[in-house]
């Protein structure tokens, strides 16, 4: 049995979850400690104030003492958009390490959302729901992520800066009367979501919405759900709930739903987002599994150490996402499949020579699928255009550094290799060697493709 601690430094709340993991019983949550500290000021200023920094370090020191009490075998601490968007992130992380001993990983948006998907998969019912058209709505403090699943495969994903704290900050700057907040918020959301609808929802039928957030999920699991604790809510119940929010004061909402008063403004914003997405998709059912980023961390840890049977093929989701990007930029499907087959055969046959692993194989696979996406912009400047497209497009499940590796592989498939890039582009030695090896494999695969 292993004892694992997951720490989430969120924009509005910091949480610690303690788990035990066994092969027979799987993952079991032992304790969940939450602390309210608003870090959302970074969205406006780009910095953490000294007072907030002191408070955050005090919280993390307390977390360390709790972990010592539980004698945890391992831990992972992650920070999301509030820390990610600071201007001096490296200094903040160094201060936290020096003052608390906690090594904090700052997740890119795609890494954060990928962990959230893993947390959903750790709950039963995920595989069955995504067999039909499903939209996963992941609501954070700084942004929301909308991902479409069709026939249990991830088909498209899009990030939008419509997080609850960011919207609250924007609304407070507009300085409107409380009675105007609702209509103005709907107007803001509708303007942004209409773009998503035009791009991704033309011919799709969405039957289910899976909601991941810190506010409305708790209510759906409690009072709002069809059956208490099930987390399922139908369209009519959602409409009744929204009408209640509009017609009642904050104190009435606090008493009726038994929720903290400071949560109500963010609850209203989160509910408005869910309502607008439900109207846009015309979904029949909303499911709130009540998971958090911490659940994704422990799932990934258990998966890595083979303490848990795999529930869903997440690697295939990354590949499907890359195929969708290739299709959007009118890449050649047949050519990409041929190149993928040749490149992966070379990779698998030369493992003793190149010494790379499964993750690098995935990066090569994505590079083959996106090898010609730059043609959408320019048939001449193909390498640079492909690089620009890949760096500007989010590939769910890949970190920023991994996306940069893929972009460079595709770039130097069309251009002469720049051997000085290790020193000039902030790429470390290990990443540089990965780019060199995978570019060489892709170039050989290119030369061996008779159809080209």
Indicate residue ranges for each PLM-predicted region.
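Conserved ATP-binding subdomain of kinase catalytic cores across diverse folds
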Residues: 23-45, 68
């Amino acid at each position: 049995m292993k004892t694992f601690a997951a720490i989430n430094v969120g924009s509005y709340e910091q949480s610690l979850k303690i788990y035990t993991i066994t092969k027979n019983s799987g993952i079991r949550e032992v304790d969940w400690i939450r602390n309210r500290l608003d870090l959302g000021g970074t969205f406006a200023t780009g910095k953490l104030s000294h007072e907030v920094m002191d408070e955050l370090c005090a919280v993390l020191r307390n977390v360390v003492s709790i972990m010592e009490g539980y004698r945890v075998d391992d831990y992972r601490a992650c920070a999301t958009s509030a820390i990610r968007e600071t201007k001096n992130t490296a200094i903040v992380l160094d201060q936290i390490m020096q003052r608390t001993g906690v090594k904090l990983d700052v997740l890119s948006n795609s890494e954060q959302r990928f962990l959230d998907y893993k947390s959903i998969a750790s709950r039963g019912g995920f595989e069955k729901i995504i067999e039909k058209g499903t939209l996963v709505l992941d609501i954070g403090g700084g942004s929301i992520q909308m991902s479409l699943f069709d026939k249990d495969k991830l088909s498209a994903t899009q990030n939008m800066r419509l997080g609850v704290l960011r919207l609250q900050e924007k609304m407070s700057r507009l300085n409107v009367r409380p009675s105007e907040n609702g209509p103005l918020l709907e107007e803001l959301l509708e303007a942004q979501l209409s773009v998503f609808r035009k791009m991704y929802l033309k011919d799709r039928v969405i039957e289910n919405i899976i909601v991941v957030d810190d506010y409305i999920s708790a209510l759906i699991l409690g009072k709002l759900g069809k059956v208490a604790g099930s987390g399922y809510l139908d369209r009519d119940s959602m409409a009744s709930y929204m009408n209640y929010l509009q017609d009642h004061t904050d104190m009435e909402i606090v008493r009726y739903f038994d929720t903290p008063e400071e949560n109500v403004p963010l609850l209203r914003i989160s509910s408005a987002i869910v309502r607008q997405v439900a109207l846009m998709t015309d979904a029949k059912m909303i499911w709130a599994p009540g998971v958090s980023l911490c659940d994704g961390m422990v799932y990934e840890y258990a998966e890595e150490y083979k303490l848990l049977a795999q529930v869903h093929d997440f690697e295939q989701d990354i590949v499907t996402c890359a195929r969708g990007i290739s299709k959007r930029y009118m890449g050649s499907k047949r050519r990409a499949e041929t190149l993928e087959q040749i490149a992966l055969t070379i990779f698998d046959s030369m493992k003793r020579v190149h010494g790379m692993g499964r993750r690098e194989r995935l990066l090569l696979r994505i590079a083959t699928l996106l090898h010609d996406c730059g043609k959408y912009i320019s048939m001449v400047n193909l390498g640079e255009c492909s690089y620009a497209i890949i760096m500007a497009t989010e590939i769910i499940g890949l970190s920023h550094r991994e996306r940069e590796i893929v972009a460079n592989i595709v770039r130097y498939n069309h251009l002469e290799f720049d051997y000085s890039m290790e020193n000039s582009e902030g790429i470390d030695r290990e990443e540089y060697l990965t780019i060199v090896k995978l570019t060489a494999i892709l170039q050989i695969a290119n030369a061996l493709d008779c159809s080209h």
